[in-house]
Amino acid sequence: MSKVYDWFQERLEVQALADDITSKYVPPHVNIFYCLGGVTLICFLVQFATGFAMTYYYKPTVAEAFSSVNYIMDEVSFGWLIRSIHRWSASMMVLAMILHTFRVYLTGGFKRPRELTWVTGVLLACLTVSFGVTGYSLPWDQVGYWAVKIVTQVPSAIPVVGDLIVEFLRGGAGVGQETLTRFYSAHTFVLPWLTVVFMLMHFLMIRKQGISGPL
């Protein structure tokens, strides 16, 4: 084992990296509420793993989406557990994100020089809500269908470009297969990649600037 370690140490200096990760100074005022960002990250990782597992069985078509979800729940081994964990962790992620945002705001963590950290955090909050909106529609049941219809109709109130936004979100004039395809693509590809990018930026800035001091 030591030979493997020595091989990596010689080439990558892994000990210096490990020391940097494990020896970061933590201010004495930090309490359990400062862990809410980490809880949000853990929920995202659980979402990623369980969501990836369900893509093996889910069929993103208006004719088969609902039946494929039922198949996951009733026929796939532990499918009911995987989907339930996905739903529970989604709710927990939203809750942790909201509490984390309030904690940062109330403790002044958004102030100079951490403005960009706050901006990336707000963008991550928007992405989290977008996950909920797009994921809610994927079973394509009555609740999901009408939720999509209402949500995609909201931008129509915007002057000039409102109707164009609605058509872009729906993939056409009405809600149908094109809408489900776009929401599925956003939920499983676009939003996860954007979240990873902004999370990386968020964490790198936190590592660079450290945790904000007490009020």
Swiss-Prot record:
Annotated InterPro entries: Cyt_b/b6_N (IPR005797), Cyt_B6_PetB (IPR023530), Cytb/b6-like_sf (IPR027387), Cytochrome_b_N_euk/bac (IPR048259), Di-haem_cyt_TM (IPR016174)
Q: Which GO terms describe its molecular function?
A: electron transporter, transferring electrons within cytochrome b6/f complex of photosystem II activity; metal ion binding; oxidoreductase activity
Where does this protein hold heme c?
35
User: Does the UniProt entry include the keyword Thylakoid?
Assistant: no
Q: Which cofactor does it need?
A: heme b; heme c
CDD domains attached to this UniProt entry: Cytochrome_b_N
| Residues noted as binding heme b 1 in the record, renumbered to the chain | 100, 202
Under Pfam families, the record lists: Cytochrome_B
**How does the cofactor bind to this protein, according to its record?**
Binds 2 heme b groups non-covalently with two histidine residues as axial ligands.
Superkingdom of origin: Bacteria
Q: Where does heme b 2 bind?
A: 86, 187
UniProt feature coiled coil, ranges: none
**How does this protein sit in the membrane?**
Multi-pass membrane protein
Q: What is its main location?
A: membrane
The record's GO CC annotations read: membrane; plasma membrane
Segments crossing the lipid bilayer: 32-52, 90-110, 116-136, 186-206
Where does this one sit in the cell?
Cell inner membrane
Which Gene3D superfamilies does the record cross-reference, listed alphabetically?
A: Cytochrome Bc1 Complex, Chain C (1.20.810.10)
What SUPFAM superfamilies does the record point to? Transmembrane di-heme cytochromes (SSF81342)
Q: What does this protein do?
A: Component of the cytochrome b6-f complex, which mediates electron transfer between photosystem II (PSII) and photosystem I (PSI), cyclic electron flow around PSI, and state transitions.
Q: Which HAMAP family match?
A: Cytb6_f_cytb6
Q: What else is known?
A: Heme 1 (or BH or b566) is high-potential and absorbs at about 566 nm, and heme 2 (or BL or b562) is low-potential and absorbs at about 562 nm.
Assembly notes: The 4 large subunits of the cytochrome b6-f complex are cytochrome b6, subunit IV (17 kDa polypeptide, PetD), cytochrome f and the Rieske protein, while the 4 small subunits are PetG, PetL, PetM and PetN. The complex functions as a dimer.
Give the family per the record: Belongs to the cytochrome b family. PetB subfamily.
Record protein name field? Cytochrome b6
